[in-house]
UniProtKB/Swiss-Prot annotation:
This is Probable GTP 3',8-cyclase. Keywords: 4Fe-4S, GTP-binding, Iron, Iron-sulfur, Lyase, Metal-binding, Molybdenum cofactor biosynthesis, Nucleotide-binding, S-adenosyl-L-methionine. One of its GO terms (molecular function) is metal ion binding. It comes from Methanocella arvoryzae (strain DSM 22066 / NBRC 105507 / MRE50). It catalyses: GTP + AH2 + S-adenosyl-L-methionine = (8S)-3',8-cyclo-7,8-dihydroguanosine 5'-triphosphate + 5'-deoxyadenosine + L-methionine + A + H(+). GO terms for biological process: Mo-molybdopterin cofactor biosynthetic process. Its EC number is 4.1.99.22. SMART domains: Elp3 (SM00729). S-adenosyl-L-methionine binds at residues 27, 65, 113. The lineage of its organism: Archaea, Methanobacteriati, Methanobacteriota, Stenosarchaea group, Methanomicrobia. InterPro entries: Aldolase_TIM, Elp3/MiaA/NifB-like_rSAM, MoaA_arc, MoaA_twitch, MoCo_biosynth_MoaA/MoaC, rSAM. It is an enzyme of class 4 (lyase). CDD domains: Radical_SAM (cd01335), Twitch_MoaA (cd21117).
Length: 307
């Protein structure tokens, strides 16, 4: 097993396939990457997945940039060892045409980013015109081929989409969709749009029929009359970081222990399996939570919480 000094076991990989994107979202964290060189290859993805699988890693999330800009994404999926959960986070604009083949290539599910149901707001956030309908088509295609549950990622933005939460909850209700409401992290000076997710969560909690705490980040998912709503609150959240159980891989094949740090990246490009394995063990051992608690110093065993 891959365990760090805080008792956090690495059970999943988050692999960035590219820095390129066809949208220009005003807040984009680009998975914490700065400009990188050439993109990770099919063989490199297969290598890190194969090695990590030997240590019990059974989940892979692909992200970016826009991962569907990789024309060889099907090939990447087919090169993976058996996994319990393979998913991608995408802006959805290129999904409609590719959903079926991605499913056939082994993708289990997708997260689609959609911050607003209002065309003009969507255009402002993404700084691109003519893409909104493509995203809705992408979600429909994912549903029809069974890339489910489809999570709808909504970054909660002050003065932009705060009034759309109920509408988004109605959109996901009764379908294999989950609404994931995400606290904005400060990138590109977009923090002026930071909205209070803690108060929103309190309101959702009061209306919920049931709540379940996920192992990853100890995020809570609420059930509201047939709708599922997950809240992601990463900022100043030591519990979130203490339950961070995945290792990031950058789009130029470096191990990246934390989204918010770039001074501890380790390149594994060109290394043999044995060399990658040695670097992996050392890098995981040195991993630290970004936000730390004075009292809770180790990851606590997982249990299901009910409200
Ligand atoms: N600080 C921090 N934020 C994260 C991390 N992972 C995810 N997030 C936040 O959560 C948001 C949603 O992430 P997704 O790519 O949809 O994937 P996920 O929710 O982590 O994974 P699944 O729920 O399993 O699909 C991201 O945009 C980030 O804002 C992390 O490791 N650290
Ligand atoms: C960086 S994007 C990459 C994948 C894909 N292009 C997409 O937009 O879904 C991954 C996720 O990060 C979210 N995200 C980007 N910047 C963020 C920020 N500053 N704070 C919180 N979430 C952010 C996006 O909304 C998206 O759901
Ligand atoms: S679509 Fe994703 S990667 Fe592209 S700019 Fe928006 S958040 Fe960033
Ligand atoms: S340690 Fe915290 S900030 Fe860093 S990647 Fe994990 S959850 Fe995100």
């Amino acid at each position: 097993m891959l365990i760090d000094a805080y008792g956090r076991r690495i059970s999943s990989l988050r692999i960035s396939l590219t820095n390129r994107c066809n949208l220009k979202c005003i807040y984009c964290h680009n998975e914490g990457e700065e400009d990188s060189g050439s993109e990770i290859t099919v063989e490199e993805v297969a290598q890190i997945a194969r090695i990590c699988a030997r240590y019990g890693v059974d989940k892979i999330k692909f992200s970016g940039g826009e991962p569907l800009l990789r024309r060889d994404f099907d090939e990447i999926l087919r090169a993976l060892p058996p996994m319990r959960d393979v998913s991608v986070t995408t802006n959805g604009t290129l999904l409609a045409a590719r959903a079926e083949s991605l499913k056939e290539s082994g993708l289990d599910r997708v997260n689609v980013s959609l911050d607003s149901m209002d065309r003009d707001r969507f255009t402002f956030i993404t700084q691109c015109k003519g893409q909104f309908d493509k995203v809705l088509d992408g979600i429909d295609a994912a549903l029809s081929v069974g890339l489910t549950p489809v999570k709808i990622n909504m970054v909660y933005l002050k003065g932009i989409n705060e009034d759309e939460v109920d509408r988004m909850i109605d959109y996901v209700r009764g379908k294999p969709l989950v609404l994931q409401i995400i606290e904005l992290m400060n990138f590109h000076g977009a923090f002026k749009y930071h909205a209070d997710v803690a108060s929103l969560e309190q309101r959702i909690k009061e209306k919920a029929d049931k709540a379940v705490c996920r192992e990853m980040h100890r995020r809570t998912k609420y059930y509201l009359g047939g709708a599922e709503v997950e809240i992601v609150r990463p900022i100043d959240n030591s519990e979130f970081c203490m339950n961070c159980n995945r290792l990031r891989i950058t789009s130029d094949y470096k191990l990246k222990p934390c989204l918010l740090k770039n001074d501890n990246l380790v390149s594994v490009r060109g290394l043999s399996d044995a060399e990658v394995e040695a670097v992996l063990i050392k890098t995981v051992g040195a991993r630290e939570p970004f936000f730390k608690s004075e009292t809770a110093k180790v990851c606590q065993p997982y249990k299901i919480y009910e409200p």
